[in-house]
Structure formats: C-alpha cells, structure tokens
Amino acid sequence: MTITKLAWRDLVPDTDSYQEIFAQPHLIDENDPLFSDTQPRLQFALEQLLHTRASSSFMLAKAPEESEYLNLIANAARTLQSDAGQLVGGHYEVSGHSIRLRHAVSADDNFATLTQVVAADWVEAEQLFGCLRQFNGDITLQPGLVHQANGGILIISLRTLLAQPLLWMRLKNIVNRERFDWVAFDESRPLPVSVPSMPLKLKVILVGERESLADFQEMEPELSEQAIYSEFEDTLQIVDAESVTQWCRWVTFTARHNHLPAPGADAWPVLIREAARYTGEQETLPLSPQWILRQCKEVASLCDGDTFSGEQLNLMLQQREWREGFLAERMQDEILQEQILIETEGERIGQINALSVIEFPGHPRAFGEPSRISCVVHIGDGEFTDIERKAELGGNIHAKGMMIMQAFLMSELQLEQQIPFSASLTFEQSYSEVDGDSASMAELCALISALADVPVNQSIAITGSVDQFGRAQPVGGLNEKIEGFFAICQQRELTGKQGVIIPTANVRHLSLHSELVKAVEEGKFTIWAVDDVTDALPLLLNLVWDGEDQTTLMQTIQERIAQASQQEGRHRFPWPLRWLNWFIPN
C-alpha cells in the first residue's frame, strides 16, 4: 500500500536552489547563441535550407502562425545568411508604353534588393507579387514581397496560402522556375503593356499549426514529403541549473526585445509557478513568445522601471483571476446556496465527490468544481448501468472507463458466476455531455461502497483514472480541480479533515495557488497521492480492500454476494409455486 501525504513543498515547483541564477542580469548580445540553444532542431533545419546544396527550396515549420514566431525565425535565418547584403534583382525602365529590364547596379534601382529575409503572417496578391498601376497614362511597377526576398528567404504563414490557393500555385511556380512573370490578377482586365519577366530566386519557409500542415500535406503530398521539416519547440525541460539559466535568458531577451520590463530577482519564482500552471508540468517551462509577452505586458502597468517585482507580478495575477472569475464564482454560489448538492462533511453510502474541469467556449479560464457521483445497488442479474450512457450524455472515453472499472472489480472478486446485484452509476445534477475517464477511480470507489454497504467520507474528493489492474493513472486539469474543491471547503470553513486524493503520477503537475499551499502547510487541508485504487479506499471508506486478520471490503462484498445468492436460490420456483420453497432445506 502506497499512500503519500504531500507536504506543501510538493505543491509548487522547487525554485529555492536557483536563487543565484535569478539574481543574475541575464544580458544578451547580438552574437549570443540563444536561439540555437533553445531551438536546436529549428536552427539545424535553417542551416540545411541555406546550404548551397539544399535538398529543397521549401521548408515547413510547425509553429503558431503569428508575427512573433515568424520574426523569431526570420532573425535566426538572418544570422545564418552567408551572402547577406549581396545586390540582386534588376531595374524596370518605363518609357511610354514600352518597358525593358536591365540588371541592377545599385540598391536604389526599383526592383533591386540586398539579399534579405522577409516575413509576413498575411498577404494579398498585390502585396505578395507586386502590381502594375496606370494613372493618367503613366505606368508604374511596384515590387512585392517576392521581389524584396529575391536571393534570400520568404517566410509566410500557411493559412494565407490555404485561404488563397491561387497565390500558392503561383508562388510554387516562381520558386521552381526561378523566374517571375507579370500576369493580370483579373483575367477580364489584362495588363495594358507587356512586361518582361525577371530572374527571381528565393527559398520559402511555410509556417503553420498542425491543422494547417495537415491540410497542406493533403494538397501537396509530394512537396510535403520533399520539403525540409522542423518544429518550434514551445517548451523547455528543466533538468539542471543550466536549463533554468537558459529559460531566464530567453524570457529576458523576449521582454527586452519588445521594450517591456523583465522579471526582477524575486519575480522569477512567481513566474515559474505561473509557467508550470500553463504547461501543466513542474519541470517544463514555456518558450512561447506570446505567453511571455502577455505576462510582461500586463504587469508593465504596475511598474515604472525596466524590471518588475514578485509582488507586482502576484498583484497582476490576482487582478487577472478576479477579472476573469465571474463565471467560476457563480458556479461556486450554486453549490454554496445548495442549488447543486455537494457535501463536504459526513458520510454517505454509494456517493462520492469527483472533480471536474469546466471550459466554456469563449471564456479564457478553465476552472474546477466537484461533481457528485452516486451509485445504487439492488438485487439483479449483474448489469452495470451507466445512466450517462443510457441518456446519451456520456462519451466514448467515459464508457471505456466504465468498462475498465467493471473489469477490475470482476477480476478481483473472482466469482464463478454472475454477480447477483445490478448497479446504476450517474453524475448527479449533470445536464450536459460527460466524457473522459478522469472520474473512473471515483466511480469505482462509489461502486465498491454501494456493494459493500460501507459509507464514503464526503470530506475527501478524488480524481484519477484506473486501468484493469486498479492502478491509478494521471489525468489533466489537476490544479483547477483541486482548487475548485478547496474553494468550496474554504467557503464552508476548513475543518482539517478535508482533502483530495490524486494519482502519484500527477504530483509533478502541481502548481497550486499560495492560499491553498498555506492551508496545507497549516494542516487545514490535505492532498494524498496514491498508486492504486486500493490505496484510496482506506482513506475514503475507512476499510482496506484486502488483507488478513481484519475486516476488508472484499470480504464484506463477498459475504453480501453469498447472502444474495442464497436468497435467490430460495426463490427459484415461479411465483405461483413459491410455496414449494418451504420444502427446500436451508
């Protein structure tokens, strides 16, 4: 049996050993290999693309299609360019209705450029390919992004090209032919003059999310296979002091590069706690520029200098939580006003507090709340009824969890015949679809309680899924779930007996609010970690599952089954002949 009562230090990332790193200024110069340190795969892919014998002129990069990411990739590509500043392109001379092209002799020529990297997250046809304009008989040619990137690299978001397929077809043609032809965007309105084509050589980096890449692969299967591929790594694993330093330097660089205040020495632990909540891992921190910039932008209004303190960051996070917390508070009020029935004291047979995460479309913050699961057992033919499934409110994953739970129980009891009980399980006061298996451990405990006729401690909530051997498996949304139950207990008054049971594998995901951490430190709230569902049963039902020289839950259930089977044997004649049972010896 493995039951771990977690200390308050287990509930947040450990930052005490990194105080010396936090005190450093984390200055970065232009030649700092920060990008290659944090994005080694993407850096290597860029090197391959810029090689003189590159296997393809196209590169696919999995990354959010936002300007912050495109600019990061562009800056990294610029540092790798060996021919940067080389004059390429030409000059179009317009004389009346005659246009001719000559080689560029200076950067001032209208279609000349110094080899460079150009990035755009959204473009229209004229912006990408340039255009011919005519006003009062005068003709002018305007270069597009492909001309600006001539001899260099064009970085563009995939959603632009997927939304405008003709742009992609023309861009691919230009890259493959290494030549730019002037054509009319509207076939009904041809160009008023003939414009000579020009040599144009560039490499293209297509940036997209997983869905965009999948759509592009379907549209261009051969090119997708041949293109160089890499990904922007959006998280950094914290394995030692060096990786912590690396992350601090990345955050500082992102803030300074965007003219925002960077974290001060005492702000780093607070930022790391919030970062761990974002990634869902104590030892995984985000590299997302958008996430970092959001924190720095919101706290900037609270500080005057070029750094912000831990107190200022805490205040900003509290303000954000309050600003976004109306919906969560209303849901808590429903429980506190007993419109949704959740008990946090006492005992009930076949009733348990599970934990759920609520996400509303359009709402920026997920929040947790307890869910009451009930189980009723009666004499029957061994059928387990999932009411959610029967009412078509249960998803496939939830149904799978129910079947796994039943398989564990039947295997443990080792019955030679069908169990003489039927059971029904449901999420009480749940009126929308339920899916996922994160409540399967709670459902199993409720079922065992009902079968054994032993009450469940209502002061304790539980989350986690189980496999067919009863092992507790990790689930998501852990911080929100625990904080949701804690908020209800706190509003009703903490008794010191309340707490939450979680799978041991979930401990590494904890990054809880300071108020909850303080309650655990003071012994007013408890969090237990278990490896197996049988470890949770003594906490919830005050009886062990199996053992010698003591009353156990398995023994209690088997005795009830034996009694029910004996009664069933007595009534094996049809009702009109029931009097014959009197002649059957006991």
Where are the model-predicted features located?
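Residues in well-ordered beta-strands of folded domains
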Residues: 62, 205, 353-356, 374-376, ...
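Conserved ASCE/P-loop NTPase catalytic core
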Residues: 2-217, 229-240, 249-311, 316-371, ...
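Short regulatory helix/loop adjacent to the ATP-binding pocket of P-loop NTPases
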Residues: 212-226, 513-519
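A short helix-to-beta-strand connector/capping loop
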Residues: 200, 225, 521-525
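Peripheral, non-AAA+ core regions of ATP-driven protein-machinery
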Residues: 1-3, 9-11, 15-24, 44-49, ...
